[in-house]
Amino acid sequence: MTAKLEKVLIANRGEIALRILRACKEMGIKTVAVYSKADKELMHLGLADESVCIGPASAAQSYLHIPAIIAAAEVTGATAIHPGYGFLAENADFAEQVENSGFAFIGPKAETIRLMGDKVSAKHAMIEAGVPTVPGSDGPLPEDEETALRIGREVGYPVIIKAAGGGGGRGMRVVHKEEDLIASAKLTRSEAGAAFGNPMVYLEKFLTNPRHVEVQVLSDGQGQAIHLGDRDCSLQRRHQKVLEEAPAPGIDEKARQEVLARCVKACIDIGYRGAGTFEFLYENGRFYFIEMNTRVQVEHPVSEMVTGIDIVKEMLSIAAGNKLSFTQDDVVIRGHSLECRINAEDPKTFMPSPGTVKHFHAPGGNGVRVDSHLYSGYAVPPNYDSLIGKLITYGTTRDEAMARMRNALDEIVVDGIKTNIPLHRDLVRDEGFCKGGVNIHYLEHKLAGEKH
């Protein structure tokens, strides 16, 4: 590795911090772990070369506190910073400050994060690159009522109004009939201004029963980009993914190959650097771009399992200034992989369930991978996201991956706190999901049906 990547500070916690640390160690890169006062017991702290406390339990004063993270990098002589996912991973100001302070940011350039973070400019960039997008206002929804109503008519109801600065399911409102459009637009504008500091909204056609299919890409920022196939993340609750798989089952092959090629072209067009994900809605054999995630994703392991490519190591290599070490022809999608997100939460009410893990036993066997920072005696703090691990299986077929996941879910033991493992045990035996190709409303409808 070049001097650029001699020592990496991992600006995150939990399972992803451990995941990044493992990749660094494999590549002979020194590591710096940072942690809040609530996270003194994190597993990766003992494995890192150095660890630095960056503040109190509150994320705003620790994992989101840019000066503390940059100071930790300076004190330890780190040469690069990996943001992981969540926290500051898609914060363009952070990426900029990291680079301006003389460190390498393991991710895209700040201007790329800005471009893709604003949903309106992102959509423009995708239209220019030939990536299929959802029909809509193709820019901010005009405040002029007549023009707005005309756009609504052209797109056809139902439509969805979205905040340009929103994301993760926040800042959106569905409008079913024309007479509600203007009031809904005003309401979303004022909410967006308050929540995101940006009142701009745009309008899109609302797809009623789509699937969520995304494309994983790697791009070296030096003119070369490749895709690692697609993933299906349609099993969601409140816009949060619960279970993911690769490749997406039952997709029209011609549409798939076309969208994969367009995503690669888009990376080259925008000068993308690092790992990224293009998220699409897929309905009636067509793809519609929704957003691009400019970071490593929670569900990256399923793509690793079916391609044999280590996404985090590639991110590190690209950040060191290397070109991609392989071409698209070298990428072969083999078999099938599933991932269950294990959360510390009540499986019925979904309320967080922090506390001490009395006993943890990880499942094993052929084609089983566990990405988790849990250990017996570890106390899950109440301050952060409830994700405590990911259970990943691989099989030569989807059925085999599913059978292995059933076994793994039956074997795993997490005592002392409540988890959503019972929900996953149910899902991998659910007839609709086992058939493949369920839409993004499937899980919520299933859960609602069980309540009544």
Which residue stretches match the model-derived regions?
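N-terminal beta-alpha lobe that positions the nucleotide/phosphoryl donor
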Residues: 1-278, 282-293, 297
